[in-house]
From Swiss-Prot:
Keywords: Membrane, Sugar transport, Transmembrane, Transmembrane helix, Transport. GO terms for cellular component: cytosol; plant-type vacuole; plant-type vacuole membrane. It is a multi-pass membrane protein. Its main location: membrane. One of its GO terms (molecular function) is sugar transmembrane transporter activity. It is found in: Membrane. Belongs to the major facilitator superfamily. Sugar transporter (TC 2.A.1.1) family. The chain crosses the membrane at residues 26-46, 69-89, 103-123, 126-146, 157-177, 181-201, 264-284, 299-319, 327-347, 357-377, 396-416, 426-446. Sugar transporter. This is Sugar transporter ERD6-like 7. The lineage of its organism: Eukaryota, Viridiplantae, Streptophyta, Embryophyta, Tracheophyta. GO terms for biological process: zinc ion transport. PROSITE patterns: MFS, SUGAR_TRANSPORT_1.
Amino acid sequence: MSKASDAVREPLVDKNMAGSKPDQPWMVYLSTFVAVCGSFAFGSCAGYSSPAQAAIRNDLSLTIAEFSLFGSLLTFGAMIGAITSGPIADLVGRKGAMRVSSAFCVVGWLAIIFAKGVVALDLGRLATGYGMGAFSYVVPIFIAEIAPKTFRGALTTLNQILICTGVSVSFIIGTLVTWRVLALIGIIPCAASFLGLFFIPESPRWLAKVGRDTEFEAALRKLRGKKADISEEAAEIQDYIETLERLPKAKMLDLFQRRYIRSVLIAFGLMVFQQFGGINGICFYTSSIFEQAGFPTRLGMIIYAVLQVVITALNAPIVDRAGRKPLLLVSATGLVIGCLIAAVSFYLKVHDMAHEAVPVLAVVGIMVYIGSFSAGMGAMPWVVMSEIFPINIKGVAGGMATLVNWFGAWAVSYTFNFLMSWSSYGTFLIYAAINALAIVFVIAIVPETKGKTLEQIQAIVNP
């Protein structure tokens, strides 16, 4: 055992405060708030194009093809951000990666605000996509690494809540202001994240990994409070880091070694099922789904946005009590039911049956679907991904898992209209089948991680 490791075994607590009531972890709350400003920025980027589409096309005389390229560049930029964010977060720290993400988003929004033609518009969209993709990896990782095990799941779920809120706020405000003003508003959460990072500590686990032991102890002390005894947690982190440091530096092919394969399978599998269960196709084309079913589009979109935020928010307090696995199972079951109800609706419409039931069933199916997604499959894959990778492969593995997620988002959104043209009810039956497979996957492969430290989880998953 090294001297640094021996040192942290001394009781790291102010003896004058021993036995007193522990501090509230206010710095954890502040750090999480700053981090999820990035999540809100993510949602603002994702929700921008829908309310701005008509005005941008009119003001800049864009063709459908040009605006379609503008929309797709967000996902392309996000895939680049996803695959590079892991190495960046390992090199300059979690805070450094969030600063890079914020800077890309700000530059992208400024390019959109001052765009006079399609080139500046597209470059701005690509930059915001890069920032969004990087945020999607580093925010849940940072929160998981700073949060106490007792409420880590709830805090990590805030990432998904703020993404949903950002999308909904962009949609609502976008109906009231011009597209340039909406882009200007998009800068606010990015700037809040960038500035807020100066007032919070770096991830203690990253500091320990890079050998900055004094800063590691100071950051952990700041996060846990002056009255907390951090000696046990500090020793566990240091011991685990030392064990991992004896291993060679992780490369891409190392992810498929026996010691890591289960964590890779869990994370990649959850990302695949989250996306290929249909969420982005249904999310991006909700208005057209309601229109095809004969339900008022604006009313349906408002109900959709509110339900998504409310269910995700209600889910946060129970994550650390109910556990990750039960929420995933309940969520996937609800997704199957929602898809089947929507499939019945479109089957009736195609075969010209029960006309009055078609719009009702369509709305019920979509709302059951989005409510179920928000209850588990929306947030839990990110929570689990942030917990299961050892820190020596977290950058490579987490970046690749995020890339898998963004590729799935692109693939589903790209193919959705083609599938609906082929068979509207068949599309939802395919999604129902994929979500049914997700239930089997969760039961057979995914472990329960609630109430355990990251080091305990990784020891179980990667023995």
